[in-house]
From Swiss-Prot:
GO terms for biological process: acute-phase response; host-mediated suppression of symbiont invasion; negative regulation by host of viral glycoprotein metabolic process; negative regulation of monocyte differentiation. One of its GO terms (cellular component) is extracellular space. It is found in: Secreted. Binds 2 calcium ions per subunit. Belongs to the pentraxin family. Its main location: secreted. Residues 1-19 form the signal peptide. Homopentamer. Pentraxin (or pentaxin) have a discoid arrangement of 5 non-covalently bound subunits. GO terms for molecular function: calcium ion binding; complement component C1q complex binding; identical protein binding; virion binding. It comes from the Eukaryota. Gene3D superfamilies: 2.60.120.200. This is Serum amyloid P-component. Its cofactor is Ca(2+).
Amino acid sequence: MDKMLFWVSVFTIFLDVFAQTDLDKKVFVFPRESSSDHVNLITKLETPLQEFTVCLRAYSDLSRHYSLFSYNTPGKDNELLIYKEKLGEYSLYIGGTKVTARVPEEILAPVHICTSWESSSGIAEFWINGKPLVKKGLKRGYSVAAHPKIILGQEQDSYGGKFDRGQSFLGEIGDVYMWDSVLSPDDVQAVYYGSYVNGSILNWQALNYELNDYVIIKPRVWD
């Protein structure tokens, strides 16, 4: 292989592994249970969060618990974690404290999840497939720390690592957005139907990410 072809190959691999790109109508595929496969979502968040909304789509046939969105900061485990406990139960952790929302659910169905929280009231909201669940409260007056490691596919037990296969995600994740505000009900509906974009912290259509180990990008073929 000549030098030019070699460096073109290296550059292509680099773009595939560490990239900013429009992932509209695509998904990250996590094809196996592991303690290593994950995606690092890269953001320059330098100010603590007083409120936020996270939305994503997921499709998995796992029956056990697993992490959907893991946000850790130095010295703070489960600073912000969206976690599926079991069929029909979703938890939000803020500063190591959690609340759980419950919803009737089919095991093999894709799901759209939006979760929001605001410090002033401590109210956490869950929306599953565009429908609001019972509001819960936690960590009133708290600030979610800045400079996070945001991981898909694994739950962090340290800053950016210490993964457990038994908490890993197997399946497909897409349409990941994060805002530094609580979205209105109308905006959540718009996100669910795919017409509201431009997340201020994470934007699926202009995403900085790093693929680690066995994670593949494929077209999304489900709703």
